Amino acid sequence: RKPIMNARRWLSFLGIAALALSTGAAAAQAEGKPATARATFAGGCFWCVEEAYDKVPGVLATTSGYMGGKVKDPTYEQVTTGRTGHAEVVQVEYDPAKVSYAKLVEGFWRNIDPTQKDGQFCDYGPQYRSAIFYHDDEQKRAAEASRVALQKTKPFKGEIVTEITQASQFYAAEGYHQDYHVKNPARYKFYKSGCGRDARLQQLWGKAGG
């Protein structure tokens, strides 16, 4: 009987814990604090940006896609022409209780070359431009404040040319682009190394890069 009683107590504990978690989530929503939030960043090849955010505690999901242009439902082939207006982006779903938007922006800077216009590393064209796409006024203020602070403390001499612009319609990229660093690790490492991304980040940011 003792094992049965212990099991019952354990199940009772689990029930109470689950209730507490659901109550906490409901309370957070009642206070106007979303359980999840979105952030969107363009930092050149979306494979690399996706990998960077997949490592961040509090990030729930990342999706590679396109944003910033006027062409509806663009394909990768269309975007790579540089004529759609879209940039390769990664939309980040995160838990604001575990990671702040400001922290995500801070990580963004250290994974791009903010001095490079119309491209990132070995990839050139407006589709590879760097940009922060804000989803509300609070994100806009945080992004702009971060850029001002970086301008004063940056460890490099170049001018910061990264755009800060309002988010528009997000179009998810084709399935083979999603989680590319996980599905195709060898090809991904070959591309990233050949593109000189890590080397340039270290040159710009030192040990804080990447």
Question: What residue spans do the PLM features occupy?
Answer:
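Low-complexity intrinsically disordered segments
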Residues: 1-2, 20
